[in-house]
């Protein structure tokens, strides 16, 4: 068992390493900002990313220092941070968590729902043009009462604009690329037989397979031999 002095020395050494990493990270961040500034007069997304990294590093360091002193980090934050700073930081954490949940794969139903909403957002239907065309069709009719959209057949000869078709094709390509990227990240093949309903169930099935595959393999071979006979 480590002595208290040895344990404290280990924590101090860990704290020194973290501070050194922060110093190097800060130096690299400043160097990166200078390079980006000379290239394109500062990228707003880069500034936000670096600011987020800086705040996360400062919070992590404050947690470690507070634990070393035997204090409560939340109480220290309440003393050192203003209400506005604390609320802003909590909001950032919630937004970051929500973004991760939106991007991460949970199950195929939620994935299909996210793809549909993303597709609707990307396609952006032209409601003004739709209303304009509808009014023109109504004006062609002798009576508004005779205008029954359910009985119209002019949609058969309707041809969408070339721009809209290209946008749809581009959207489908992006969906295929995202699906391929997610498939590679999960380590699955699109042609594989799907035996799971979500990522958690897939990992559970793999664990079962590791422990019981030798038994199920024998049973499967026996069944195949019996079927062949």
Curated annotation (Swiss-Prot):
Single Gene Ontology BP annotation: mRNA cis splicing, via spliceosome
Domain of life: Eukaryota
Coiled coil: 44-104
Keywords, comma-separated and alphabetical: Coiled coil, mRNA processing, mRNA splicing, Nucleus, Spliceosome
UniProt-annotated stretches for the region Disordered: 20-40, 106-142
Main location: nucleus
Biased amino acid composition, Basic and acidic residues: 115-140
Subcellular location field: Nucleus
GO cellular component, one term: catalytic step 2 spliceosome
Role, per record: Involved in pre-mRNA splicing.
Protein family (similarity comment): Belongs to the SYF2 family.
Subunit-level organization: Belongs to the 40S cdc5-associated complex (or cwf complex), a spliceosome sub-complex reminiscent of a late-stage spliceosome composed of the U2, U5 and U6 snRNAs and at least brr2, cdc5, cwf2/prp3, cwf3/syf1, cwf4/syf3, cwf5/ecm2, spp42/cwf6, cwf7/spf27, cwf8, cwf9, cwf10, cwf11, cwf12, prp45/cwf13, cwf14, cwf15, cwf16, cwf17, cwf18, cwf19, cwf20, cwf21, cwf22, cwf23, cwf24, cwf25, cwf26, cyp7/cwf27, cwf28, cwf29/ist3, lea1, msl1, prp5/cwf1, prp10, prp12/sap130, prp17, prp22, sap61, sap62, sap114, sap145, slu7, smb1, smd1, smd3, smf1, smg1 and syf2.
Full protein name: Pre-mRNA-splicing factor syf2
